[in-house]
């Protein structure tokens, strides 16, 4: 005998909203009534045939900018350290 009420709730008319082109369509899902997606078939290059980029500042770009700032700070700290070492040698 199968257990009762173990299946997830199914939303037959869930609203999907594309965050890139603001296209909306209705489809069934078990997640939630309104879903936001990054790319849909309306704006995806495979389906549209155009090579346009959706989000230019994604996670990778944010990581690269954060890493570049860290490298700049490390370079400044290294330079200050070398300057301090040279001053210490002069004072001896």
Curated annotation (Swiss-Prot):
What cystine pairs are annotated? none
Q: Which UniProt keywords apply?
A: Ribonucleoprotein, Ribosomal protein, RNA-binding, rRNA-binding
Gene3D superfamilies membership: Ribosomal protein L31 (4.10.830.30)
Query: What do the Gene Ontology cellular component annotations say?
Result: ribonucleoprotein complex; ribosome
Q: Which GO terms describe its molecular function?
A: rRNA binding; structural constituent of ribosome
Q: Name one GO biological process term.
A: translation
- Matches recorded under InterPro entries: Ribosomal_bL28/bL31-like_sf (IPR034704), Ribosomal_bL31 (IPR002150), Ribosomal_bL31_A (IPR027491), Ribosomal_bL31_sf (IPR042105)
The family assignment reads: Belongs to the bacterial ribosomal protein bL31 family. Type A subfamily.
Q: Which HAMAP family match?
A: Ribosomal_bL31_1
Q: What does this protein do?
A: Binds the 23S rRNA.
Under PANTHER family, the record lists:
50S RIBOSOMAL PROTEIN L31, CHLOROPLASTIC, LARGE RIBOSOMAL SUBUNIT PROTEIN BL31C
Query: What does the subunit comment say?
Result: Part of the 50S ribosomal subunit.
Q: What is this protein called?
A: Large ribosomal subunit protein bL31
Species assigned in the record:
Mesoplasma florum (strain ATCC 33453 / NBRC 100688 / NCTC 11704 / L1)
């Amino acid at each position: 005998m199968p257990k009762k009420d173990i299946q997830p709730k199914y939303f037959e008319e869930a609203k999907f909203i594309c965050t890139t082109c603001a296209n909306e369509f209705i489809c069934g899902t078990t997640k939630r009534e309104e879903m936001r997606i990054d790319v849909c078939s309306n704006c995806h290059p495979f389906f549209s045939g155009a090579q346009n980029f959706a989000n230019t500042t994604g996670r990778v770009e944010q990581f690269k900018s954060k890493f570049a700032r860290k490298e700049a700070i490390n370079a400044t700290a290294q330079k200050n350290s070398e300057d301090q070492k040279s001053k210490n040698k002069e004072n001896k």
